[in-house]
Amino acid sequence: PMTVKGVSGVYFAVWAPEAMRVSVVGDFNLWDGRRSQMRRLGDSGVFEIFIPELKKGAVYKYEIKFKNGDPALKADPYANYAELRPNTASIVWDLDEYKWNDQDWMKKRAALDTKTAPMSIYEVHLGSWMRKPTEVDKRGREIVGSEFYNYREIAVKLAEYVKEMGYTHVELLPVMEHPLDASWGYQVIGYYAPTSRYGTPEDFMYFVDYLHQAGIGVILDWVPAHFPKDAHGLA
């Protein structure tokens, strides 16, 4: 989201060098690719558009028309938020609303000599590390179900465990948006969107913020080489 000449709205840009036409489509224009056609920036392969009055929470995709005439609907590879699977659209979001509280951690990190300071890293996949109990057996024991904890809920549980075990950092298996649970995040669709399986971008910010306040560093796995073949993705 941004403001141009006093008008609030959303600026979109995407690189699609082989496209004949690119449009932004969503509920706001009845998913009609003829309405919000993007402007090509010279020979750069980049298409752009500013859509006035569009607000946070708007669901959208890019409609791309190729040289063979066939259109394709693609999620925004630069989006910060996506619909919860099995839905595949991107969501307009504003990342500036969260108020961070980890100033003490950031000062400590800046003063730390990372080459010599001790480090003990706990690698974890959030979706399989712990899930919500959904049933109780005849002995009164909780049976783990398939529902994930959200980022805020698991932050509390993970921080407590990691501190008790003496780790200094957690390393998260990929939390970027991905279509398939079983891939553990290693088939990425949205590199700039924390997966909506566990909540909103603000929820993820809270997760990092909470661990920082508990004195725990957060490392993210980065997977730039695995592209799923889902129709709404890059490949």
Question: What do these predicted regions represent?
Answer:
Residues 1-11, 41-123, 128-142, 146-148, ...:
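The feature marks proteins involved in alpha-glucan
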Residues 14, 26, 51, 64, ...:
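Glycine-rich, histidine-containing beta strand-loop boundary motifs that form or position
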Residues 15-22, 55:
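Short proline/glycine-enriched turn/loop motifs at strand-loop junctions of beta-rich domains
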Residues 34-42:
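Solvent-exposed serine/threonine-rich low-complexity stretches and specific carbohydrate-binding patches
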Residues 103-116, 125-235:
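Substrate-binding/active-site clefts of carbohydrate-active enzymes
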Residues 22-24, 60:
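Short beta-strand elements bearing conserved aromatic residues within extracellular beta-rich modules
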